[in-house]
Amino acid sequence: MELFLKEKINPSSFRFQAENITNFLERIDEKSFNTVFCFGVLYYMPEPLHLLKLMARAAKETILIDTFTASYSAVQGKDAPKYYPHLTSQILNLPLMISCPTQSKKKDYNLPEAFNRKGRSLSLISLPTKAMLELWFESLGLTWEQLDWSSHIARDCSFHDLLTPEQKITSHWADVYASGIRVSYKLHV
């Protein structure tokens, strides 16, 4: 919100809502917002397609999405070493989704749909490939453009370049986009 105020955007022209996103979007009227932002949320949803449907219903014009992809499963969490030997570019180009366990208690919030395993509270993250995301967009009748981060990308890389703690520490913030670990879209409703 500070950014919007700093940029002198009229407070009556935006609204930030902090609550369960699914419950909120299910009860609002269709086409309630010109633009719906979805940054860092989609992968925490047990059913990401359901959230996409709700956002498409709520938006008049545009949905902006920034999310992790299936490649993220190869670099994040203690199970990552089990995943990355099996993740090839051929697999990551298929329309599929990988679900991985993650701690349900985060720094500032708790994830929904928690379950206990060996005394730890866990949730799942849902990590679709780009192909899966675009299949969903098409099924919802949306047109899209992938946002271009190339002007910020310092080097070509893949998730293989971001496996170790040392690689992550020395990486540039845009490496997650260059590697396909993260992707951004502008969806037209």
What does each of the following model-derived ranges do?
Residues F4-L5, S32, T62, L140:
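A general secondary-structure boundary signal
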Residues P46-A58, I63-S184, H188:
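S-adenosyl-L-methionine-dependent methyltransferase catalytic module, highlighting the catalytic core
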Residues M1-L25:
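Class I SAM-dependent methyltransferase SAM/SAH-binding core
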Residues G40-Y44:
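A short His-aromatic
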Residues F14, S32-N34, K60:
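Local beta-strand N-terminus motif with an aromatic residue
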Residues F37:
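A conserved beta-strand element that flanks and buttresses the S-adenosyl-L-methionine
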Residues I9-P11, E30, A58, S139:
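Short, well-ordered coil/turn elements that cap or connect secondary structure elements
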